[in-house]
Amino acid sequence: MDKLSKGFVSAVCLLGVGFGMVRNMICTRTYQEDPSAFANAQIGYAPMVGSTDHPNATLRYLELTWREVEPTEGQYAWDAIEQRYGLAGLREQGIHLVLRFVCDVPGQKKHLDIPEWLYAQTADGSWYSTSYGKGYSPDYANDILRAAHHKVVSALAEHFDADGFVTYVELGSLGHWGEWHIKSSDGLVPMPDETIRDQYATDYLNAFSNAKLLMRRPFNIAVSNRLGLYNDM
């Protein structure tokens, strides 16, 4: 038998051995039909922290007002927030957060969602009582508010962005519920122009490096920075 023939026979033998090994490794499994929902980790609907709905959800929504985050200028109430929302327990359970920071949440009574100290330094927004509810809408073009926002978002990132506990950060801050719209037709100070809005968004872009950033609407800065979009939680 010449060398070429011997080589061909050897190759055929090796292929045969290989096929035999693969055949011995094949494992067949039969799955039972299951119509129930199953966990889709960190994707989909996120009930609010503290809600009893969907107790097995591994993603929870946490909304923080500026007033509760920074009650005194430059001092952040992390211990109070951790205790109020039971964040240590959520971490132990492997639950992750969707975080939104807000300045104006319409409610049933007149109230402030920014800190008293910040209101005292600005006070150029609009108190309102509309079909949305009651509250105070800041003038987001105010330079003092802008500078303070840069600092508080940096503090939020320093506290929440290091350990992966917060998976998503919704770019709130502006407008009612942090949704980037204001009922200005009722006489409220309107939303700032795109240049100023982009400055607020840039605060988040510069501060957070681990959490995925989301916007309520596909503004130009969201497109150019490949941000995700979210619907209300």
Describe every region a protein language model picked out.
Residues 28-144, 233:
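N-terminal substrate-binding region of glycoside hydrolase catalytic domains
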Residues 64-68, 73, 101-105, 164, ...:
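Short, flexible loop/turn elements at secondary-structure junctions
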